[in-house]
């Protein structure tokens, strides 16, 4: 079994901390069933991942991209803004392109309270027999 050290891999990945992150991510991928790019030689997954990086059978940039993708919880999707949004500086100016009006219904405080009471479940009072 050949000993793989950080010095063997540091010329492939500049930062040793990034190297550890990439090797750990690759070791987890191997544990979850990813194909090996080199012979295992009875080595454990972290050693195999370091050997893959040292022998350049995997691309560190691809590994970095996969690592970032695996850590993302939410993917941002750029949605187009509607064309009718007025600019901040032109608050007093009118938009002539589209004359859509939004009707806003005003509610009194009493109507709002009645509506909220209808949404809340009633608490039942336990009946006590004496």
UniProtKB/Swiss-Prot annotation:
Pfam families: RNA_pol_Rpb6. It catalyses: RNA(n) + a ribonucleoside 5'-triphosphate = RNA(n+1) + diphosphate. GO terms for biological process: DNA-templated transcription. Keywords: DNA-directed RNA polymerase, Nucleotidyltransferase, Transcription, Transferase. GO terms for cellular component: DNA-directed RNA polymerase complex. Its EC number is 2.7.7.6. GO terms for molecular function: DNA binding; DNA-directed RNA polymerase activity. Coiled coil: none annotated. Residues 80-99, 110-130 are annotated as: Disordered. Residues 110-124 have a biased composition (Basic and acidic residues). Belongs to the RNA polymerase subunit omega family. Promotes RNA polymerase assembly. Latches the N- and C-terminal regions of the beta' subunit thereby facilitating its interaction with the beta and alpha subunits. The RNAP catalytic core consists of 2 alpha, 1 beta, 1 beta' and 1 omega subunit. When a sigma factor is associated with the core the holoenzyme is formed, which can initiate transcription. HAMAP family: RNApol_bact_RpoZ (MF_00366). This is DNA-directed RNA polymerase subunit omega. The lineage of its organism: Bacteria, Pseudomonadati, Pseudomonadota, Alphaproteobacteria, Hyphomicrobiales.
